[in-house]
Amino acid sequence: MDELNSFIGLARSYIDSDKLAELDKILATIQNDLFDLGADLCIPDRDKNPDSLKIVISYVKNLEKEIDALNGQLEALRSFILPGGTKISSYIHIARTIARRCEREMIELRQIEESEISKEAVQYINRLSDFLFVAARYVNLKLDFEDILWVPGNNYKE
């Protein structure tokens, strides 16, 4: 989680446009959420008291709301896209891949008998990676960079 949070912070450090002010606020909220997630993950459910931080469904719903808001401003995808564009977008794509790795590791840990990682925590990190994908595209749009489309077999045409 620390690596993921750090890359989000790195992406935010490059935001200097008013066009991305709202996204910066969302990313700041996510950075705080990731600390909450870390607190949730470090204490097994059986050892938590009622006041312990836990990722609950409202975290997931808030992310889904933000995904819908940003995605509503983007053109529908016609192809897969390649990570890139602006520095901010590129760092957000790196954060997205780290979120996917965290998700895989959390799922693996959930399968261990003694693990007590909540389904809400896994849902949150899953939705976060989706949010970061949409956010990277949103950054490129707002900063007038086009998505880089994947062209299957482009390098091997005769």
Residue ranges and their predicted role:
Residues M1-E158:
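Phosphate/pyrophosphate-binding loop motifs in nucleotide- or prenyl diphosphate-using proteins
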